[in-house]
Amino acid sequence: MKHRTAPMVRHPLAAALCVATILPGVALAQTPRERALEARIAELERQVYLLVSAQQQQQSQIAQTQTQVSEVRSLQAQAPAAPVVPAGKKPIQLSSITPNALPGTTFRFGGFIKADFMTTRTSDGALPEGAVGRYLYIPTQTPVGGQASSTDTDFHAKFSRFNLGVDTVTENGDKLTGFIELDFFGNALASQVNNLYGGTLRHAYMSWNNWLAGQTWSNFIDATILPEAADIVGPTDGALFSRQTQIRYTRGAFSVSAENPEILTTPYQGGNTLLASDHGVMPDLTARYNWKGTWGTFGLSAIARQYRTRSALTNDTDFGGAIAGGGRWIINSSNDLRYQLSYGEGLGRYLGLGNGSDVELDVDGNIHTVTTVAGWVAWRHDYSARLRSTIMYSRVDYDHALANTGALASASQQSLRTNIFYSPLPKVDVGAELMYGRREAENGDSGDISRLQFTTKYSF
């Protein structure tokens, strides 16, 4: 009997190949459970990779932030210290908002919105349409001569103003200041259609430590003592009131300046006519000294001037000057007294808004200075923190030569006014003022002016 195992023995290579072919198929035949486990492992590996990447990115961002913080702290250490702010108050501005400004520069903006409502009566003639005297008290414009009386009503907002200021303290401690202020006193299309008012430059100056250059209040005057009034000046007749371009040096309470040498001239037989000229070579030179204490303030000032004329008849030169004193006396917490007195040869341009002439011309065109005495006094009383009133009297006298000026030149001007102001809110003022003024000419003719004025003002 024959066996069938021989062929398998004879072909071992074929058997091995058969087994090798079958086994991989068995190994690849995974169950669904095994495939699910492998998928979960792959997902876990992906999440671990994402976490590691996020951590590396976060560490990079932290490093960048630390670098930026270090740079900011370095810049802050180099910048000047911020001003100390009182407890409970936040600073309005921490850094400059002016382009290319020096470090430590601050910017300020201010002003007020003022509206005036007034009715004016003149006894001897009318104030012309558009005359400056229709909007504020100009003593030289008070009509005289016996013409019919006139009454006018005017509303305007000409004296609203705004200002810009820049202040800097350098690394060396030098103080730099720039200041500019405008109102709308110009008369461009004053009451036509839209009541457009032209801008008027009040202040435009810069200061460096003790030096000042530009246009501002004359060093000869002290504007801080002027009383509160609905009128933009108040005691206009006898008050020193002038802003002009100058160079000033201040050291403590003492100051000196060289200022614009404009003069006001009454031509021969010109009556009340005032002509402006600037033929002078020498600037107006002033000196001032101020005292202040718990009692109030007081100041003395002096001015030296040169007067020159040019005409077909002659060129003449003369010199003059003036002195002034004034201040504020604090009587008590509810009352104060303000005052000023001035005397000089050629003082007219510095009084009020150019109240009178500095010089007059004779028949040959020669200069003669006009002797002038002026002053005012004002008493203020506070009824409460919100309600107050002021009464004031002002006067100026001129010593003209009738042979030079003629009979219509002003011999004197005076006014009396009283007002009351109420502040319903901080920075808001409403007030009413009654004024009576009188101008007398050299020939004895006179004219009166009365004005009732209401005003509102919001300061910012």
Model-found features: residue ranges?
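C-terminal closing repeat unit and adjoining cap/tail of repeat-based domains
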Residues: 416-433
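Outer-membrane beta-barrel "beta-signal"
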Residues: 422-424, 448-460
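N-terminal periplasmic/intermembrane-space "pro-region" immediately following the signal or transit peptide
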Residues: 28-128
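Gram-negative bacterial Sec-dependent N-terminal signal peptides
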Residues: 2-28
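Outer membrane beta-barrel
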Residues: 94-131, 139-265, 281-282, 286-292, ...
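Sequence/structural signature of outer-membrane beta-barrel proteins
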Residues: 120, 185-189, 218-233, 259-272, ...
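Detector for outer-membrane/organellar transmembrane beta-barrel domains
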Residues: 292-410
